[in-house]
Amino acid sequence: MKKLLIATLVCAGAAGVQAQERTVRGVLGLGLTGGGDTLATVVYTDGTTDNIKAGGLVHVFGGAEFRLGTDVTMQATVGYHVDETNGYSDGSLRFSRYPIELLAHYHVAPNFKLGGGARFVNNAKIDSRGVLSGARFEFDNTVGAVVEGEWMVSPAIGLKLRYVSEKYKANGVSASGNHGGFYFSWYI
């Protein structure tokens, strides 16, 4: 019985060390964002309105985090960022884009990291459906900057606040996509 207990403790200790030394792990996340210029306003038949913002609203992403040292990590993610009008029966507009982010983080404390990097936004467009179908507007690909802080609630769960500075351009017109956001990250 003693040998089994000792063997179990040794294996548990080795597993803990191995978990701490992992140099690559996956990350999945979800964020709520707000800000940026109003790209479009929809007026419904009942008189209500709804706006599409260049910095809104939901951002989902997945990727990998690479540990470069005890205090530094790099993160590479691909995501989908979207803002959409409510639509109901009148139709709706959607502003969607596909950001690729390359970020570096410095771990200022065991449970907190600060960082930032570049955000490459691809295929940004406004499209429509319902009675609004046919409306479509495409933006040029763009590069922005990200600054963020993340509190690690546990080794696998992070909560972050971030700010993104970016600008969308098309046909000589530009719109600010600057926005802030609150994110949930799951490290696997």
What are the residue ranges of the model-derived segments?
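Surface-exposed loop and membrane-interface regions of Gram-negative outer-membrane beta-barrel proteins
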Residues: G47-I52, M74-R97
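Predominantly the C-terminal beta-signal and adjacent terminal strand-loop region
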Residues: G35-T41, A135-I188
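Cleavable N-terminal export/targeting peptides
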Residues: M1-T23
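Short glycine/proline- and aromatic-enriched beta-strand/turn motifs that initiate or cap beta-hairpins
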Residues: A19-T77, A104, F112, V121, ...
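Short sequence motifs at beta-strands and strand-loop junctions characteristic
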Residues: I52-L57, S92-R97, F137-V143, S174-S176
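Outer-membrane beta-barrel translocator domains and adjoining extracellular loop/strand segments
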Residues: T38-G47, N86-L93, A124-A135, K169-N178
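Repeated loop/turn-to-beta-strand initiation elements of outer-membrane beta-barrel proteins
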Residues: L4, T70-M74, N111-L114, W151-L161
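Transmembrane beta-strand segments that form the barrel wall of outer-membrane beta-barrel proteins
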Residues: T77-E84, G116, F120-N122, G158-K167
